[in-house]
Amino acid sequence: MKSALFVPCYVDQFYPQVAIAALTVLERLGVQVDVPEGAACCGQPSANAGFGRDGHATIERFVNVYAPYERIIVLSGSCAVHVRLHAGEVMAHGGRTDTAGARVAERTTEFCSFLHDEVGVRHVAELGAAFDARAAVHIGCHGLRGLGLAKPSEIQERPFDKVRALLAAVRGLALVELSRPDECCGFGGTFAVGEPAVSVKMGRDRLRDITSHGAQVVVSTDMSCLMHLDGLARRERLGLPMFHVAELLAGTARAR
């Protein structure tokens, strides 16, 4: 299967080590994966800010770059949801009569979803990852409710958590139980710009829950959430390292 790794803008600019870790994990697991040249933003920031035409042009480029691939593995639940929901409709709105947008949307998956659903937890465990720490797990809202990475607390169904299942394969890692496990971090992309006071309050509440349960590190599926929480934690001098799931699985988690 011909696969591509999509690296979100903020990961590319601020956390390239996370992209390298994800690529390392995929290659060790035998996934044939490219990081295409010419890859662009998924278009979500423009769309969320109300600049529809700019967002459409960006997602059209995304579709053109990734159309040849059978699987597009995205290092962000937020970006993955945007592509899955809007790639098809944007291309159709632009007058395209082919189904490239719909195909790209269908083939797009988030990194942890891909590992859990298509590679398999047993195979991931063969990586032999190890990290001694008490960790709090934060799943971004888009990944939780948009992609089904875990059961949201408001849904009365049998519990499941794909991210914890993957992290259970990391030797020495103890996952702590939070009082409000699926609480939003408060970032929300442009929400943090438009409503900074609310965003900060939500982030501090999230950190309070994490630290009160003795977590030594925070692990997440989304670096955008961790960027927000890390900024708040540094300002309050909490000494709380934060890592993407890929860094733990690759064995490259180091304090930043």
Language model segments and positions:
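Iron-sulfur cluster-binding electron-transfer modules in prokaryotic oxidoreductases
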Residues: 1-256
